[in-house]
Regions:
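Short nucleic-acid-contacting surface segments enriched for D/E, G, S/T with interspersed K/R
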Residues: 1-12
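Divalent metal-coordination and catalytic microenvironments
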Residues: 6, 112, 221
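Metal-centered catalytic cores of metalloenzymes
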Residues: 12-17, 24, 47, 102, ...
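OB-fold/S1-family single-stranded nucleic acid-binding modules
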Residues: 12-46
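Acidic/His-rich, divalent-metal-binding segments that scaffold phosphate/diphosphate chemistry
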Residues: 37-161
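Alpha-helix initiation and N-capping motif
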Residues: 51, 55, 70-71, 81-85, ...
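Divalent metal-dependent catalytic cores for phosphoryl transfer on phosphate-bearing substrates
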Residues: 98, 107, 118-236
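N-terminal intrinsically disordered, cationic/polar leader segments
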Residues: 218, 235-236, 240-265
Length: 265
């Protein structure tokens, strides 16, 4: 039968291995897979960390935010049972390159915020509450920018027309304005983190990081995305392979040799 977007397919192909480009499948025939031909659980990629554990870690991290305005902002936006919170917990973090699966945005945002929290204790002069809040919310626009059809992830109309940074900024800004007495300096600080987290104008940010907190979130976010690409690449390697083929996200190949048994496991 005719295959639908995001639905499993059965592929008949010829395998070959090119010295330069690596493993290749030349597709001969493709059709929609029948329900008895696949296990949905095997096709549903997800985070390596159990979902319930991530939710517990999220609650614990929000609980460490001392500023009452910032904690209320996080609780309003990310609480379970709210429209924004439920979408944020379920959304993917990307279309292809890293955490491109259900709950991927939660996984990515939480890991960035945890990294920011740890680094804030190392470097002086950083407002930890602002940095952690900005880290948890920096990609919140992706709940509108991406849409999922079955297993397929693509940009929504809003994502194409406006972009995830403006979508996220205005969602957070509206919530800050709805909190009575929310300080204008905190509004500026958190908003700046969201607007600048891509780091450069040519990478899609309307401004570059101008505060310690924004710079920290940008660099940890970039690190998280890069390491997420390594995870994605490694999953696609055959047993025993150490080198990947060229990967666009890394602008090169990835190497997975000389690893300790504990890490390899």
């Amino acid at each position: 039968g005719e295959a639908e977007l995001g639905a499993p397919v059965r592929v008949y192909a010829r395998y070959s291995c090119d010295q330069r480009y690596g493993s290749t499948l030349t597709v001969r025939r493709l059709r929609a897979a029948q329900p008895e031909e696949f296990d949905p659980d095997q096709l549903a990629e997800g985070p390596p960390i159990p979902y319930e554990q991530m939710l517990g870690d999220l609650d614990n991290l929000i609980g460490t935010v001392q500023n009452p305005y910032l904690r209320e902002l996080l609780e309003r936006l990310l609480a379970a049972g709210t429209e924004t919170g439920d979408r944020w917990r379920a959304a993917p973090a990307a279309k292809v390159y890293h955490q491109a699966y259900r709950h991927g945005l939660l996984e990515h945002s939480l890991s960035v915020a945890q990294g920011v929290s740890a680094m804030a204790a190392t470097f002086p002069g950083i407002d930890r509450d602002v940095a952690v809040t900005g880290a948890l919310l920096h990609d919140i626009g992706k709940i509108e920018a991406y849409q999922q059809t079955g297993g397929a992830i693509d940009l929504s109309d809003a994502g194409k027309l406006q972009g995830e940074i403006p979508l996220g900024y205005y969602r957070v800004r509206r919530q800050m304005e709805a909190i009575e007495g929310f300080p204008s300096d905190l509004c500026q600080a958190v908003g700046h983190i969201i607007l600048s987290h891509h780091g450069k104008l040519e990478h899609g940010s309307p401004v570059t990081p101008c505060t310690r907190e924004a710079a920290l979130v940008h660099f940890i976010d970039n690190l998280g995305g890069t390491l997420g690409s390594f995870d994605r690449i490694e999953k696609g390697l055959a047993d025993g392979e150490r080198w990947s083929s060229f990967d666009r996200a890394l602008s090169g190949s990835a190497y997975f040799g000389a690893r300790s048994p504990q890490i390899a496991a």
